[in-house]
Amino acid sequence: MFINLNPLEQFSVYSATSAILGSSSNSLAITSLTNIAILFIIGLLVLTIFQISASSHLIKPTRWNIVLETWVASILGIVKDQIGNDAKNSLIYFPLIFTFFSFVFISNILGMIPYSFTPTSHISVTLGLSIAIMIGVTLIGFSKHQLDFFSLFVPKGTPLALVPLLVLIEFISYSARAFSLALRLTANVSAGHCLFGVISALSVSACIAVSSLLLKGITITLPLAVLVVLYGLELLVALLQSYVFTLLTCSYLADVVNMGDH
């Protein structure tokens, strides 16, 4: 079946072509329709946040305005701390960083809704984001420093004999940033959702196995209490992973933007 009443269905990938054409073979894509729909919704939410934050000039701000202003100020603070207090750089890169943070955070939060979908739990989404980030960072480095960009792969004071080896190591390290950025986010988000599924399944199995009403109540109440606590922790993880993703993106940008300052 295409749709199952299973909270872990979001981890199953259904081919978009097979879902539309009814064929499970020779599919041309592995992107699920749910993924496409949720990404579209998240994009609309991010644009809505931008629009509201840009058009709200109230003398007495509402709570929503205060939340948005705090949101914007926090991301702007990260950009300034990592890339520098230069107003020009902050204004240039802030919209990009803010968009990445908003996208990842909203994706993580939407995934906390039962029977919903978490795009960031799929490596195809996070790897696509991280590869796009590293390509963009590389292009920015080339545009600002031209051929001097390659000095990033040669640490200062390196003996001439060690230059080929260190260039290879630095290049591999630079390329691996995309994979580490994607895997970190996917692993942390997926781990929490899998833990929810395991505890829920054990609770249902234990409830079916026992016959006493008292024991049934215990097997339902205790796991439910644990799930509530884990739910709160997952909300914190959703925010924390968004922050880490944004912080690392700013750090990678700072490496190429401020090359001449090191």
Curated annotation (Swiss-Prot):
Compartments (UniProt record): Mitochondrion inner membrane
Protein name per Swiss-Prot or TrEMBL: ATP synthase subunit a
Topology relative to the membrane: Multi-pass membrane protein
HAMAP family, per the entry: ATP_synth_a_bact (MF_01393)
Gene Ontology terms: cellular component: mitochondrial inner membrane; proton-transporting ATP synthase complex
Similarity remark: Belongs to the ATPase A chain family.
InterPro entries referenced in this protein's UniProt entry, alphabetically: ATP_synth_F0_asu, ATP_synth_F0_asu_AS, ATP_synth_F0_asu_bact/mt, F0_ATP_A_sf
Keywords: ATP synthesis, CF(0), Hydrogen ion transport, Ion transport, Membrane, Mitochondrion, Mitochondrion inner membrane, Transmembrane, Transmembrane helix, Transport
